[in-house]
């Protein structure tokens, strides 16, 4: 096997290697990322595919960068899985390909058409798909002109009947940036931290007329992105002033005036990681922060 030295997990007698998988999926027909008994999920499909291709005795256990909700899409999702080196070799067969390339090819053949693995590679030392990440970037697409609604894009674009004022929305988003407690925009989970660093939140009018929101943070809590979008839509329509989202933020509790927007407009576009030599330290830091 060539390329980066494998990230070995566990004792020398039980050496396992860590693989990084980059994938995309149309979330329309999935009940989110996380495996749930009796429901079709991305994790369930991918774990089953890996288990089948590598003929594993137990279902493959996956760690994901961002646990997307039901209906949310991903163009740049990242996952890691720990396996034994001889298990990876089973993907090669008679293909003559490198094991990682062979696994990616075979997974593309096994997975359903609404999910695809773009790349498989040996993870650098210290890599953790979730905790090594320094940022996640989401995109939200809106059509605010009924005459320009494209039925062919109905699975990824949310349609509104009222035009939105981009300048007003961007004036409001600037007040949300930085390290803050976003409890007012998160679905409450017992013991879970709601402190996040919002690095970017802006709206742009694209050449095709769609409005695109780009939201970047170190991490997001449950339903945070869709609530942030929902807080800005009434600013764009003029129903609320530009100070409204910041006022909601300071309350620290969910506000019934903030609508959690539909899932299908949201897509995980990119997950950012530090340089290889900083991966392990970042993972330790992130774990400690989540446990605070």
Q: PLM features: residue spans?
A:
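Structured-RNA-binding interfaces characteristic of tRNA pseudouridine synthases
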Residues: 2, 7-292
